[in-house]
Structure formats: C-alpha cells, structure tokens
Amino acid sequence: MSAEAKAGLRRTLRARRAARPPAELEAAGDALALHADALGPGPVAAFVGIRGEPPTLALLAALRARGVRVLLPLLLPDYDLEWAEYEAEDAPLVEGLRGVLQPRGPSLGLAGIGEAVLVLAPALAVDGGGRRLGQGGGSYDRALARTQAPVLAVVFDDELLDAVPAEEHDQPVHGTLTPGRGVTTFPV
C-alpha cells in the first residue's frame, strides 16, 4: 500500500483519538493496568502514552509495584530511541522532544532495548498479521530492529484492524495489549 494510504489512515486514526472523551481515556488507562500480571516478570521496555495514545502511567505503576524493571524511551533529535530505566513513580518524568515524557536517569544507549524481554510499543493501529502503523517517524521501526524480544502494540480495542498498510522497513509485532482484550498474540 502506498505512503499516501498510510498518511490517510494516520489522519483518520488521529482524528478518532482526538475525539475520545477524557473519561474514556482514563478508563482505558485503568483497564490496561489490570493486565500487568499477564506481561511477565520483565524487564519490559514501554512508553508513556501521549497525545491521545492509550494512557500507560497506571500500567507502568502496576508493573513497578510487582517489581518489574521498566525501561522508557529517550527520543533523540534524529528520532531514534535510547532507553533509560523508569525507577520510581514519584520521580518526575521530563518532557523531551515532541512532548515525549521520559525519565531523568542515565541513558542505556540505543542498545538498551536489548535488555527487555518484552516490548510494549505505541501504534495507531495494528492488524492480525502483526503489521503496525506508527506515527510515521520510524523511531520504533529502528528500535524494534535492535531486539529479539516479543513486541506487543498498545492500542485501543477498535484499533485492531483487518488490514494495516505496511512497507518493507516496517517492523512486525507479535500481538497487542488493549484495554478490553488484554494481551492478544498473533500466529507466527
């Protein structure tokens, strides 16, 4: 599918996210946290949901409460991702590039994602074949190429689509984590 088709789908999905009421977002974040036990002992590379993404702070707190080591991305000027440990909920996150909330801790570098045994990746949509539609900057496609860990795309339940356009450089995911369905894995 063309880059134009991906751009059109991104516009549609972003508009849908922008229309979600705050109460729905809050409920989605609380529901994601209920699935923390299904994510294993970690370490887990995750992210802080921003700009209409599924809220993940409650999930991160639930993982940390279980003693799971959580890594969060540090967005670089070239849109690549380094990683840092999220050490405590009471340590304020700082706003990085493009509004990405990230820990203050020392960087583990680009290869830091390799310390995770599971990756939770943001996405606008995903399909049952593991095709993930991101924001279009390539940050996660580059980062996911550096890990062998299973990857779950964190999306709203209605963002699991029949088909998502993909290009050769797009990194596949192994399943989804949604507020309503929890963890869903795809046949490999």
Label the model's feature ranges.
Residues M1-G114:
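N-terminal active-site beta-alpha-beta segment that forms phosphate/nucleotide-binding
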Residues M1-R11, A15-R20, A65-R66, E89, ...:
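Surface-exposed, charge/polar-rich loops and edge strands
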Residues E26, L57-L59, W83, R132, ...:
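A generic "cationic amphipathic patch" detector
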Residues V44, V119-L120:
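Receiver (REC) domain switch-region micro-motif
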Residues V48, A123, G180:
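Glycine-rich, N-terminal phosphate-binding loop of Rossmann-like dinucleotide-binding domains
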Residues I50-G52, L124-G128:
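Short glycine-rich anion-binding loops that position phosphate/pyrophosphate groups of nucleotides
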